[in-house]
């Protein structure tokens, strides 16, 4: 009986303590999976030499697409994503980061694909390895749909998946 009262007291105390805990502001933590805040990518440079940070686009829906010309599926998807967004006039900014090691290959590919180069970037030097590792791209190139608050809505979408998702939103 003595132990029962003790466990009852401890149980009530724990319930009381847990009910008084406060939640954080409701913001997601930074990470690379849906529901997480997408980490900022800094010093992106396009073929004209313009630099920007991904956070400069906060307040807009963004599709971040990692790709390379030598990787046929990611290259094809890069073109198809651009076409879906442009042709359907979706309110989404596509930011593509290429991992081509040769800058001239990157530039020629953009020209051949007829994609607006303003938000097409190439990962250079230190950015190449840090982005490649951080986003675990050795397992394959990825893409992320990010909402206006920087939270990842979805990842690894096909162009058709993106089209269907944006029709709903």
PLM feature spans:
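Hydrophobic beta-strand anchors of alpha/beta hydrolase catalytic cores
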Residues: 63-64, 94, 143
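Short, internal strand/loop/helix patches
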Residues: 107-148
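Bacterial Sec-dependent N-terminal signal peptides
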Residues: 1-28
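Thiol-/selenol-based redox modules, centered on thioredoxin-like
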Residues: 140-169
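Short active-site neighborhood of thiol/selenol oxidoreductases, capturing the structured segment around
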Residues: 52-75
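N-terminal "domain-start" segment that seeds a small globular fold
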Residues: 23-54
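Structural microenvironment flanking redox-active thiols in thiol-disulfide oxidoreductases
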Residues: 75-113, 127-132
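Active-site-proximal beta-strand/loop segments in catalytic clefts of secreted hydrolases
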Residues: 66-67, 97-100, 123
